[in-house]
Each structure stands twice: as C-alpha cells, then as structure tokens.
Regions:
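Catalytic cores of large soluble enzymes that bind and process phosphate-bearing ligands
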Residues: 10-13, 17, 21, 37-45, ...
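A generic secondary-structure signal for well-formed alpha-helical elements
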Residues: 29, 57, 156, 170-171
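Long, well-ordered, tryptophan-enriched scaffold segments
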Residues: 171-280
Length: 280
C-alpha cells in the first residue's frame, strides 16, 4: 500500500500494477474486518471497480456517491485513510460509510439504500453553475429493490445530464441469463472500435434532414433486435446509454469503459457483474 499512498498516483499506474494493487487491497480488507467487524463480502466484491474508478476520476473534485456506503472501504484506503482503518466503526475512529466531515473525497453521507441516483441534483447544479466536475452514482446491495432508485433513474435518463450510474450486480438476478448470441453481441458493444464508429455514424447521419430520417428508421430496427436479445431495454427506455454486462473483476476493461463513459455528453449506465466475497 505504501506505493499508492496518494489517490492521484492511480491515474498513471499500469494495468498490471492495478491488478497487483487489487490483491493487496483484498488482503488489507480481510485484515481490517477481522479486527473491526463490518461488511466483508460487499467490499471484497467491489475492489476492482473501486480501483478502476480512482484511475479515471479525481474524487477530490469529482462526485462519487455510494448507495448505502457499505462497499466504500477500498475508497477510504485509497484516499489517505489506510492508516486509520484499524479504527473503523469505533468511537472516535473513521466511519463505516462515506462522511464528508472525514474527507473531501466523500461527496455525501450514505447509509440508506436506493438514494445514490439523487446525484442528478449535483449534475444539474454543475451545469447551471458552469462547473466541470464529473458525477458518478454507484448502486449495489439490492438498491434496485427500492422505488426511489427507479424514480431517480427515470429523471436522470430524461434529463440528458452527463451522469454515470454504475449498477454493481452481485447476483440479484436482475436480468435473465443470456444465450451465446446475446453474450457475443454484448461483448461487441463494449469494444472501443464499436463505440467510436457509433459516434461517427451518429454525427454523419444527423448532419442532414434525410440522414436524420434514416437514422430514426435504423434506430428503431436496431432497438427491436436488441430488445429481443440483450438485457438493456429498461435502462435505454429511461434514456440511458447502456453498457454491459461487463466482468466487474477485470480492472483493465473497467478502466477503459469508465474512461469512455466519463466523456459521454449524457447519462450512461454501466452494468457490472461482480462476485460478493471474491478472494475470501
């Protein structure tokens, strides 16, 4: 951990170093929780995702909001609090959830499920004030069982505000299992070449009135095929650009997709599949 004392150093580490860091963090989580108690499985499952987030975003400026907050231990370790982790959840020690009074890297207090997409308010405030920070909401631990999450998703999708929502799906069976063709198509949709080609196609087609008409026709045909094969219809119907499902323990791919999502001028939902308690 001494090699990565400062969160900012993660932006320049290699993929191999990121993978090594994830293993170090897993051992550290087990060490800390064995002494202080607390949610072990959810934190072990979010290691690669949290490292990837810190490779892309600057949490001293960007807003990273955890739903519930029980999976924030790696975030705390990477933002100057690793040496205090033995005081976790003790009187006078650091909190077991994000706490702005504790660090500038904690955007707001969490503790209740289904509230993270309320970060839409931060995104709207950013736009109106002419600021340029990024906004990310991390959903997990059954947050989609609460109606408040769907209200937030509906409003965020229709707002058009640049906002990234990450769905940490650790086995809640949100979608039906996918067949071979659907899995292949999902992988193709995540490739950089596809993402770049789609943006170029969109700009060309929207440049002229006939192009816009053709774009709408092709878009409807594509949606009909995609809806029958891929588990993204609900989120795209809400107005999100859907990406996934993706392996939540592949830190290289996660970093690439988060970097892309951070540059999209609109709401993005990244669906990440993780294993609770991985490495334990």
């Amino acid at each position: 951990m001494n090699q990565w004392k400062e969160y900012s150093s993660l932006a320049n580490i290699s993929d191999q170093e990121a993978e090594e860091l994830c293993q170090v963090l897993r051992r550290r989580i087990i060490q800390v929780v064995s002494q202080t108690d607390g949610p072990l499985a959810s934190n072990l499952g979010a290691v690669e995702l949290t490292v990837a987030l810190h490779r892309v975003y600057d949490t001293s400026r960007d807003r990273l909001v955890f739903d519930v907050g029980h999976q924030c231990y790696v975030h705390k370790m990477l933002t100057g609090r690793n040496g205090q982790m033995e005081t976790l959840r003790t009187f006078g020690g650091i909190a077991g959830f994000p706490k702005p009074a504790e660090s500038i890297h904690d955007a707001c207090i969490a503790g209740h499920a289904s509230t993270a997409v309320s970060t839409l308010g931060m995104a709207i405030a950013r736009t109106r004030l002419g600021e340029d920070y990024k906004v990310v909401a991390l959903l997990g631990d059954g947050s989609l069982t609460g109606g408040l999450a769907y209200e937030g998703l509906s409003m965020a999708g229709q707002s058009g505000e640049p906002l990234v929502v990450i769905l940490n799906d650790n086995g809640m069976s949100i979608d039906a299992s996918m067949g071979g063709v659907a899995q292949h198509l999902a992988k193709q949709r995540l490739k950089p070449q596809y993402l770049q080609a789609r943006e170029i196609y969109r700009k060309i087609m929207n440049a002229t009135p006939p192009g816009r008409v053709l774009h709408r026709v092709f878009h409807r045909i594509k949606d009909a095929i995609k809806t029958s094969l891929l588990p993204c219809s609900m989120f795209e119907d809400m107005g999100f650009q859907y990406m996934g499902p993706v392996d939540g323990h592949d830190v290289k791919t996660l970093t690439r997709l988060l970097d892309y999502a951070s540059k999209v001028n609109g709401p993005v939902l990244l669906h990440v599949k993780t294993i609770k308690g991985k490495g334990c």
